[in-house]
């Protein structure tokens, strides 16, 4: 999709673009924020058992676990 410099457009072209955008937006299905928040919360809660950020990563499968041992020179 080409980049359009709005400053180079005529007023008629700007208004046409605005009308086109509004036509697209009017067809969008809208939902109440409260309903969406409930659905997102339910989705997260259903999958929280599988989420490594919630339940953690088992030590044997943690790729970032610090290696044991080493040498300290004083």
From Swiss-Prot:
Coiled coil: none annotated. The keyword Membrane applies. Its main location: membrane. Disulfide bonds: none annotated. The keyword Ligase does not apply. It is a lipid-anchor. GO terms for molecular function: G-protein beta-subunit binding; GTPase activity. It holds the Pfam family G-gamma. Keywords: Cell membrane, Lipoprotein, Membrane, Methylation, Prenylation, Transducer. Residues 72-74 form a propeptide. InterPro entries: G-protein_gamma-like_dom, GGL_sf, Gprotein-gamma. GO terms for biological process: cardiac muscle cell apoptotic process; cellular response to hypoxia; eye photoreceptor cell development; G protein-coupled receptor signaling pathway; phototransduction; protein localization; signal transduction. Retinal rod outer segment. SUPFAM superfamilies: Transducin (heterotrimeric G protein), gamma chain (SSF48670). Guanine nucleotide-binding proteins (G proteins) are involved as a modulator or transducer in various transmembrane signaling systems. The beta and gamma chains are required for the GTPase activity, for replacement of GDP by GTP, and for G protein-effector interaction. Belongs to the G protein gamma family. This is Guanine nucleotide-binding protein G(T) subunit gamma-T1. It comes from Homo sapiens (Human).
